């Protein structure tokens, strides 16, 4: 049985897809892992020598890594709205953060996936710029939403979204620099980080960057948790992960 691996790191990483019968190949499971406020700088597979992200790096190394991918919505909810609709933010007036305009519900990806027989879940990021009921488009949406829900029928393919806040920039202001734990516990040394040229090289900024990279390492463990679950259930060879 041949397994093909692709991985694309935009704000997340990876795609695992492979064997099984021909019908299963036509309807793979889809696992969409979303993270917040990240860039290629935050991951080892894009050249950061100071952060440990072995799971994401292995996904990139085993498949296709995108080096010229760009967001068509340069902020939180506009970017998310573009991905879930497959459209430019300006197409439906979604380019302003949390500026609500009427949007045709049928443009949303979960509507198409459910019509194709997929069980669709979201845990639980639905911050889209739309007046539509962002939860109604899912079979299950909320803190307990999962592809492991007993409501999913046997052998029914799933489209499942999970979101982690571990790298959200709001986390930076949640802890004063003198309240953060020793970064050495995570293998990080703020003094040795390579800062972007446009930021001030001061201890506070170095602490912020190290704190953010600590979140990236937490994300790597989080991604690994899902991959382990897919392998345990023997779903890994017919699941797209991105």
Regions of interest found by a model, annotated:
Residues 2, 6, 14, 20-242:
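Formylglycine-dependent sulfatase
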